[in-house]
A protein has these predicted regions:
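Short, charged/polar, Gly/Pro-enriched secondary-structure boundary elements
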Residues: 51-55, 112-115
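Vicinal oxygen chelate
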Residues: 13-16, 66, 71-114, 119
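A short beta-turn/loop motif at secondary-structure boundaries
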Residues: 36-38, 63-64, 99
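Core segments of cupin and vicinal oxygen chelate
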Residues: 2, 9-52
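Short, charged/polar surface micro-motifs in flexible loops or helix N-caps
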Residues: 49-54, 63-64, 79-81
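Short, solvent-exposed beta-strand edge segments and adjacent coil->beta transition regions
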Residues: 2-7, 67-71
Length: 121
């Protein structure tokens, strides 16, 4: 019935600042950036490394306040390596914690949206 989750809307205050964070800190690739609706609003679509699901940095959903997205899980086969690379990019990321399902670390974007980086057992 469904193929996949194509896009996840990430609510942000400042689209340009958020784009810089997601591309420089997380290594996302800019797919497209164009005017959207009002002159101050952009359609910014990003690709996560090696993922099918894309991110859209949104400001136009009043019910989605910046920082309201929590618990989006990114997976990796080698959390220690990924964690070290993100720390080298000056990402404020938690220490790696052992959980019943594997290893995980958490971080937030500048708007407070919460992410989980996970390595399964």
């Amino acid at each position: 019935m469904f193929d996949r989750i194509a896009l996840i809307s990430i609510p942000v205050k400042d689209q340009k600042a958020a784009k810089k964070f997601y591309t420089e800190k997380l290594g996302c690739t800019l797919i497209e950036e164009m005017p959207f609706g009002t002159p101050d609003t952009l359609w910014i679509r990003l690709a996560l490394p090696r993922a099918d699901t894309e991110l859209v940095l949104v400001t136009w959903f009043p019910q989605m306040k910046p920082g309201s997205v929590q618990g989006v899980v990114l997976t990796t086969k080698n959390l220690a390596d990924t964690h070290a690379k993100l720390k080298a990019r000056k990402l404020d990321i938690s220490d790696i914690k052992k959980q019943p399902w594997g290893l995980e670390a958490t971080f937030r974007d500048p708007d407070g949206n919460g992410w989980v980086l996970q390595q399964s057992k």
